[in-house]
Amino acid sequence: MAEENGRLVDLLFHDKTKNKTYVVKKQRKGVKEAILTYERVGAKETEGLKLSLLKIKLETGRTHQIRVQFASRGFSLFGDRKYGSKLAGDIALFSHKISFVCPESNKRVEFLENPASITPWDLFF
């Protein structure tokens, strides 16, 4: 990523027949706004590849949102061949933290986890 942090706002259309989401320019039936913020928390270069580790906060939760918003800007996720990555392997997308208000106790519950020590995660953790 060129910027250390930022906010991405796009209009997305999900084609259910292809199971693929596209960034579009105009509002029409089925198009939804997608918003996320990101912060680069790590950067590595290996074998000529420049990789960034990002902390992402979704303001909306659209199908393939993270994948398509970054790919549309030329930054496909590692291993995400559907959205333009030339690298084979598992998609490098991991939910490190999730929190929510428990409906029974009405208290905030938080879970943290690091990814397994496999490529590309082993470069950062």
Q: What do the predicted segments below correspond to?
A:
Residues M1-F125:
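RNA pseudouridine synthases
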